[in-house]
Amino acid sequence: MANTLDVANNLEQALRESDEFKSLKEAYEAVMGEPTAKQMFENFRDTQLSLQEKQMQGIEITEEEVEKARQVVETVQQHEGISKLMEEEQRLNNLINEISQIITKPLEDLYGTAEQN
């Protein structure tokens, strides 16, 4: 077990040292260093978190909330720095998803996939 946790800690360090994480951190710091971009990004994140909380609690999201979220997304996508930040976040998420597929391979091999059953 300790060896597995050591490998996980090494993976965490490798993620921090990856080009994907470094690019994300650089883009994040650029946005946080610009007051207007920072405010726009924080508004975007607050809107996102609010909708996620409602979904998790089973609360219906109104058309007005959907429209507001759409407008917020549209606005932040027009900001070059925030758009870059979102692209870099997606690149890191892609890497993490690939790692997740590798990590869960033993379970997939054990239980098989839905297509095999």
Swiss-Prot record:
SUPFAM superfamilies: YheA/YmcA-like (SSF158622). Gene3D superfamilies: YheA/YmcA-like (1.20.1500.10). InterPro entries: Com_YlbF (IPR010368), YheA/YmcA-like_dom_sf (IPR023378). Transmembrane segments: none annotated. Coiled coil: none annotated. It comes from the Bacteria. It holds the Pfam family Com_YlbF. Belongs to the UPF0342 family. This is UPF0342 protein OB1136. It comes from Oceanobacillus iheyensis (strain DSM 14371 / CIP 107618 / JCM 11309 / KCTC 3954 / HTE831).
